[in-house]
Amino acid sequence: MALSLAINVPPVRDNLLRPQPFQSQFRPNLLKFPIPSSARIRCSSSSSFNDISLKTVTPDNKNSFVCRFNATQLEVQETNQPYAETYAVGRHIRMSADKARRVVDQIRGRPYEASLMVLELMPYRACEAIIKIVFSAGANASHNLGLSKSSLFISKAEVNEGKTLKRVRARAQGRANQILKRTCHITITVRGLPDESDKEENSS
C-alpha cells in the first residue's frame, strides 16, 4: 500500500541564494561623455583641448594648486616672451656621481625657490654642495641677466664623473688595497624671464 505525503514548502527566492556583489556607499563621480557645456576642467595650462569627440572647455585659473601642468618639464612656453638661460658649475666635488645624481634628479624641472626648499629638507650629504651651486646659478641669473627669481626654474641639471683619486690602504701580511676616491662635476642651468621692474626702469 503506497502512501503519499503532501508537504507545503514555501517558495525560495533566487536573490537569497545568489551571492550579491559588494556595494560600497562611497561611489566616485565618474566623468561621462560628452562633457556638458557647464563643466570645466581645472587646469592652469593655456593650451586648448583639441578633441573632436569632446566639447571645448575653458580652464579655471583661480586655483593654482589643482591639476597644474609643469611647463618646465614639458618645455612649453606659456608666454610669448623669450626665456634666458644661465648656469653654474661645481667642479671636483668630493663625492661619487651616483650619490649626486639621486639628489639632482629630484630638482630637475622644479622652480628655483622650490628647489632650494627641497634641498634643505633632503637628508643627503650631496645637498650641501648642490644647494650652493643652485644658489650661485640663481645669483648669476639675477645679477648678470636681470632675471626675476620668481620665474626661474631648473631647466637642466647634469652630473658628470671627474677625476678619481687613488690611495692605498695597508692590509695584513704586507699586502695593500687600493682606495678610489671619486669626484664629480655638477652643472645647474636655470631659465627664466626678465624682471618687470627692470623693464620699467629702462623704458623710463
Swiss-Prot record:
Signal peptide: none annotated. It is found in: Plastid, Chloroplast. One of its GO terms (cellular component) is chloroplast. CDD domains: Ribosomal_L22. One of its GO terms (molecular function) is structural constituent of ribosome. Its main location: plastid. Keywords: Chloroplast, Plastid, Ribonucleoprotein, Ribosomal protein, RNA-binding, rRNA-binding, Transit peptide. One of its GO terms (biological process) is translation. Belongs to the universal ribosomal protein uL22 family. NCBIfam families: rplV_bact. In legumes L22 is not encoded in the chloroplast but by a nuclear gene. This protein binds specifically to 23S rRNA. Part of the 50S ribosomal subunit. This is Large ribosomal subunit protein uL22c. The gene is rpl22.
